[in-house]
């Protein structure tokens, strides 16, 4: 006999907003008209793009810093135009990237215990876009590899460790790029664009692997993200302005595997995906709800689970990585919902009677250790994320400081030749060891210089004291 109700351990997932005293209050959330999430979260900090006079800024708050946030609280404020997107580095919880209307990408190192003074000096400024930068996304498995996309319709992939733009995809999109998503091992990216196309791209070969014209026929913005199995999940609008979600196989994008119509609201649907549970959470900008679906390999493939509803509309949304969740409370997702003047955490829980660790809810998940160095990835290597167990809770290790070793500008070829140089098949592999040795040498030279300066100043001080002693003796 066929079951009427599909069996799923996530059928009873429920959402709950935290109490008022656990919210972050009196925050002037950015009003800039851009469809990014405006919020980024990791197990240490929550970062929120805010309104700022005379440039762009964002707040970085330690997770425990709840309650009213003072107007004089320090910010990250080095951009000269509004900040449009922020993204925490998955391999270092103190490093965050930001893209701005000032056409630059900046990478910041946050002190271990948070900011005590406003931060105006980034670790590195990445300049290469000719128009505003609306998207920044770190590589999921390679250290110091950062992608940025701008309103110049270009995607640039940077080696943050050297400050170099190593891949420039500037001729693949004929219109504005709405979003970019890395595949699970970071070998491919998928993009959604204003020309209504969804593209799957191999960035190192600079090739479009698959594309679908009119993935959604409506004119409003789309989103496309990679799932763990290599399929692509999209959100968009129908010709009649109904919000849609669809599932695609990049090997055959003629027809979607599944297509669902939801409602006629006009907020862009931001998808947040958990590869461990195969749940997708959809947060509409301007909505007051979060809908969640389970993706399986049985028809109809995208299964509606439930909706979390609240009264206030959301201006943006942050999504906590799995290693930042409380496994003892069967928490499977935590969102940070932006209101006009505050940030409110929302906790998604699977009700369980037992207090024991629930292995089926928490398979090994992506940890903070990078599987590859940047040079290895640019040479063509791929690696899946290094997994960790959450059985005894995640204990953050010590993060190493981000060091940028700029190469001699005279050694690099002119920018015009960069693309053709990259597109040639035979490529001399970068010597990783020599780059690391250069970095160490640089560090040692800096230390020697500072020791010399200290000795000089001490010498001066000693001679002054000797003179004073001589005067006193006389």
Swiss-Prot record:
Keyword 4Fe-4S set for record: no
Any single Pfam family the record assigns to this protein: WD40_4
Localization terms from the record: Cell membrane; Cell projection, Lamellipodium; Cell projection, Ruffle membrane; Cytoplasm, Cytoskeleton
Membrane topology: Peripheral membrane protein
Alphabetically ordered keywords of this record: Acetylation, Actin-binding, Cell membrane, Cell projection, Coiled coil, Cytoplasm, Cytoskeleton, Endosome, Membrane, Repeat, WD repeat
Disruption phenotype: No visible phenotype. Fibroblasts from mutant mice display a disordered actin cytoskeleton with a reduced width of the actin stress fibers. Likewise, these cells have several microtubule-organizing centers (MTOCs) and a disordered microbutule network.
WD repeats: 78-118, 128-168, 172-202, 215-249, 263-303
Entry's Gene Ontology molecular function annotations: actin filament binding; small GTPase binding
Coiled coil: 435-474
Tissues where this protein is expressed: Detected in skeletal muscle (at protein level). Detected in fibroblasts (at protein level). Ubiquitous.
PROSITE patterns: WD_REPEATS_1, WD_REPEATS_2, WD_REPEATS_REGION
GO biological process: actin cortical patch assembly; actin cytoskeleton organization; activation of GTPase activity; corpus callosum development; endosomal transport; endosome fission; endosome membrane tubulation; establishment of protein localization
Gene Ontology CC terms, in alphabetical order: actin cytoskeleton; cell cortex; cytoskeleton; endosome membrane; flotillin complex; lamellipodium; lateral plasma membrane; ruffle membrane
UniProt note: domains: The C-terminal coiled-coil domain is essential for cortical membrane localization and oligomerization.
Family indicated by similarity: Belongs to the WD repeat coronin family.
Protein purpose: Plays a role in directed cell migration by regulating the activation and subcellular location of RAC1. Increases the presence of activated RAC1 at the leading edge of migrating cells. Required for normal organization of the cytoskeleton, including the actin cytoskeleton, microtubules and the vimentin intermediate filaments. Required for normal cell proliferation, cell migration, and normal formation of lamellipodia.
Protein's name according to its UniProt entry: Coronin-1C
Natural source organism: Mus musculus (Mouse)
Taxonomic placement: Eukaryota, Metazoa, Chordata, Craniata, Vertebrata
Gene name in the database record: Coro1c
